[in-house]
Amino acid sequence: MCDVVLGSQWGDEGKGKLVDVLCDEVDVCARCQGGNNAGHTIVVGDTKYDFHMLPSGLVNPKCLNLVGSGVVIHVPSLFEELENLEKKGLHCRDRLFISSRAHLVFDFHQRTDKLKEAELSENKKSIGTTGKGIGPTYSTKASRSGIRVHHLVSEEPESWEEFKTRYHRLVDSRFKRYGNFEYDTEAELAKYEKYRELLKGHVVDSIDFMHSAIAQNKKILVEGANALMLDIDFGTYPYVTSSATGIGGVCTGLGIPPKAINKVYGVVKAYTTRVGEGPFPTEQLNEAGKTLQDIGAEFGVTTGRKRRCGWLDLVVLKYSTLINGYTSLNITKLDVLDTFKEIQIGVSYTYKGEKLNSFPEDLHKLAKVDVEYVTLPGWEEDITKIKNYNDLPENAKKYLKYIEDYLNVPIQWVGTGPSRDSMLVKDLN
């Protein structure tokens, strides 16, 4: 059976840390969607490991790791990430497997991404993408013109010629759309001819890989990227990513049925952050927001951009819970709230005087909602050295209880600092 870790807000919740903790006891860790457009840091002892595309389970020497079919892969970045891990003493190539059905991100996808974003910026409609080529790659995938891993590594005699034909066709369509954007196609093809050999040893039929593990009763952990509010269908469209970031993306990205899923863990930052453009009802453009940003060190791992900050939004989390069906929650970065005398939580939206029953899909409507807050007393003490959930300040426990009661989902873990040891486990019995 598979347990799943998913982001419940707009990303950057701290999913990697929970995955790292859980991976001590699993046999397989799998990424199901996304690309290197998101990132997180795992701290083991005194060493920090930055992950973008690779599964976090690589830090566990006994864990096999799969990059699934729903992931889009920029091969140079994949090997760069591997090399950076190796420089820090983490040698894990023999435990990394890549789906033959995953689509490839090329440099021209990244170039296209930036050109498209520049066009939107001129009309003040920028999405705020990372420029990693993720959207253009999913676009070519949806239009059935994309290039998959098996096209690159196939041993069939005509496969390399077919790869080059597909590649030139994609590049030519970009030239027609954007003109000559100073792109060296032959240099990139030469680069991929070398990557072809490097990649071959990692490529597997991911359907067989996953279902063999399930049949052998292996413990499997699925690591979702991004978060529900960035989902292509259920997020704040169009200010979203280009993949299915919720529970549905687990099945489609790995080729497993819903009945193979056991637990679904929702990761929730104790407040709310967002990178890039898009609606953010509980955003605090004031001293509270600045304090959250400073104490929380809210800067993106992938882009270095400042994250927008605000109070916890339970309307968002209720919506996220309905879609993903969390069996329990991991509240992260609770310690960031240590200095606040009072803490606010968004509990409902009203629009033109009427209370809304769900998170609105219309962004014009969303921009006009009034957020109703409840104010809870802060605990105003350092919780970073606490090792037992029961030793948390009473006001901290009341804050967590309010979240549990509102969502009707138990909290199983509470993060109180950046290291893997700064994770309190709550007894659910």
From Swiss-Prot:
One biological process term in Gene Ontology: 'de novo' AMP biosynthetic process
One GO cellular component term noted in the UniProt record for this chain: cytoplasm
Residues that hold Mg(2+) according to the record: D12, G39
Residue runs in coiled coils: none
Cofactor binding notes: Binds 1 Mg(2+) ion per subunit.
Residues the entry annotates as binding substrate: V301, T302, T303, G304, R305, K306, R307
Keyword GTP-binding assigned: yes
Residues the record lists as binding IMP: D12, E13, G14, K15, N37, A38, G39, H40, T130, R144, N226, T241, R305
Binding-site residues, GTP: 11-17, 39-41, 307, 333-335, 415-417
Active site: D12 (proton acceptor), H40 (proton donor)
Primary localisation category: cytoplasm
Catalytic activity: IMP + L-aspartate + GTP = N(6)-(1,2-dicarboxyethyl)-AMP + GDP + phosphate + 2 H(+)
Domain of life the protein comes from: Eukaryota
Pathway(s) the chain acts in: Purine metabolism; AMP biosynthesis via de novo pathway; AMP from IMP: step 1/2
Entry-linked PANTHER family: ADENYLOSUCCINATE SYNTHETASE
Family of this protein: Belongs to the adenylosuccinate synthetase family.
HAMAP family: Adenylosucc_synth
Quaternary structure, from the entry: Homodimer.
Protein name: Adenylosuccinate synthetase
Species, as recorded: Debaryomyces hansenii (strain ATCC 36239 / CBS 767 / BCRC 21394 / JCM 1990 / NBRC 0083 / IGC 2968) (Yeast)
Source lineage: Eukaryota, Fungi, Dikarya, Ascomycota, Saccharomycotina
